[in-house]
């Protein structure tokens, strides 16, 4: 599919739309359906589309495996760090009320941080799995 001009043009225009929808799902998850897991899956599927059209080597140059591992661990640290921060502020693990003076604001901040951590981790892990499976048989 690397040499198909129509696919390349469509993929170049479609990826930003997919990414924008993923960010919408990510940040709308606090107020309605959606959240980190769904956004991570949508964003990774957009990048998988890019990989299928432009090739695995090109995709790995754009997003190397070291960056993906860093993103996966950053998401986990964000999730765990939010929980540890709430404990250090005198609450229970992931007791978001402690994150702000107003408990409702604290809930919103906590949920956004947790969902962001989940989204980053899901995005990175799905791409790591895809790259490993897609790269089998290469020498």
PLM regions with names:
Residues 5, 42-66:
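Cytoplasmic juxtamembrane interface segments
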């Amino acid at each position: 599919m690397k040499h198909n001009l129509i696919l390349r043009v469509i993929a170049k225009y479609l990826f930003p739309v997919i990414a924008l929808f993923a960010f919408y799902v990510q940040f709308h998850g606090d107020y309605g359906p959606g959240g980190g897991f769904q956004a991570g899956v949508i964003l990774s599927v957009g990048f998988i589309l890019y990989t299928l059209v432009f090739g695995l080597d090109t995709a790995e140059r754009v997003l190397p495996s070291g960056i993906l591992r860093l993103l996966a661990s950053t998401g986990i640290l964000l999730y765990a760090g939010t929980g540890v921060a709430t404990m250090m502020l005198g609450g229970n693990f992931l007791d978001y009320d402690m994150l702000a003076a107003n408990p409702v604001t604290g809930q919103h901040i906590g949920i956004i941080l947790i969902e962001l951590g989940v989204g980053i981790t899901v995005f990175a892990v799905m791409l790591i799995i895809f790259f490993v499976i897609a790269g089998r048989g290469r020498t």
